[in-house]
Amino acid sequence: MLKTFNSSARSCRAMPRFLPTLCSRLHEKSGFEIRNAVRMHSVGSHTHTHDHGSDKEMLELVKALKKEGKSPELKLAWLGLYSNIGLAAAKGIGGVALQSSILVADAAHQLGDTLSDLVTLATLKICSKKPTQKYPAGFGKWETIGTFTVSGLLVAVSVGIAHSSLSRLYTILFPYAGSEHTHIGHSHNPSQLLFEHPFMALGLIFGSVVLKEWLFRKTRTVAQKTDSNILLANAWHHRADALTGMVSLLALSGTYFLNAPWLDPFFGCLVSIVVFSAGFNSSKKAFLQLLDRAPSEELRIAVTDALLKGEKLPYKIVTILGNAHAMHVIISVPPSFTSQQSSELAQKVEKTVLDAIPALSSCIVTPLSSDSNQVHRWQHLNGSSGEHSHPSHEHTH
């Protein structure tokens, strides 16, 4: 009987974490639930199904990075990153050696998390640079480019996992018809190696579950002591990894102990669908950002809240463009204002926004006369006479 051990890990991982361990999912409330950590995202953004790299997550991440390099939050964040690297390497080597789709897929998933973390840190460093003569609008789009690259890589990986899993599932269900296609992936029966060393594969998955659960408990304890929302979200993500690892462990156990080799490629197909969905949604969001789509509501709220708390000045916000690193705010000023008054007002608005949002490296403020055609066009697009005004206006969440 053909026992093709081809599973793809993390079958039920409802959210391949696109957004980085460090940029782990934030919730507006203080209570984080597992469903918030594992609901699928985006990265359509994050899907919100998860808005990958959501602006709120990026703003929180920058706040964390502003702290001392030896802060407990950053220590645990880096520990989580290192654990992903180690688990990805161990599962990848084990999956290839044992011809196990579950381990290979799990390793690919872990690698996706790691790449997202690394790209986030790298692009954050680039985006934090001040505008230059060559790049007067700043380097904010580097984050979008990095997201698009990693998302595209995950889409490609998911397609490869799906192709391998479907081929092996077909071989198991139709052994005679599939025998002529056994050259796809590997030329020998992968189940042989697995069934000779079953506890090696099970041990790798079990070890990852234990490590992730330990990280969850350790991270949650520090998060509660330091009142860190981003660290608490990260803790629940470790718990979600541990729970989904248990599903992979059950799939591996069923394949071996119940003599059900179809479980391996079947779960591999499920994982590939989840990874593809997350990658596609993240790519879509990044692509739309490159086309200068309007910023997310959470970023717009962050800007308007900053201005509401600032000095009361005679202007209205016409529109907000950009992302969490570089922003363009267009305001309308009274027609009686001179060019010098408008320029001074714009500088005050710019300083207020930059002081309130540490993630921003660039904020361009353009003042327009309230009776100008440009303002009327923007108001028509926004469907209102202005987003917010000073000094008399209301703002609700």
Swiss-Prot record:
Domain of life: Eukaryota
An example Gene Ontology biological process: inorganic ion homeostasis
Compartment(s): Membrane
GO molecular function: iron ion transmembrane transporter activity; monoatomic cation transmembrane transporter activity
InterPro entries per UniProt: Cation_efflux, Cation_efflux_TMD_sf, CDF_Transporter
Membrane topology term: Multi-pass membrane protein
Transmembrane segments: 142-162, 191-211, 242-258, 260-280
Signal peptide: none
Chief location category: membrane
Keyword terms, alphabetized: Ion transport, Membrane, Transmembrane, Transmembrane helix, Transport
GO cellular component: membrane; mitochondrial inner membrane
PANTHER family tied to this protein: MITOCHONDRIAL METAL TRANSPORTER 1-RELATED
Recorded family membership: Belongs to the cation diffusion facilitator (CDF) transporter (TC 2.A.4) family. SLC30A subfamily.
Identification of the protein by name: Uncharacterized metal transporter C1020.03
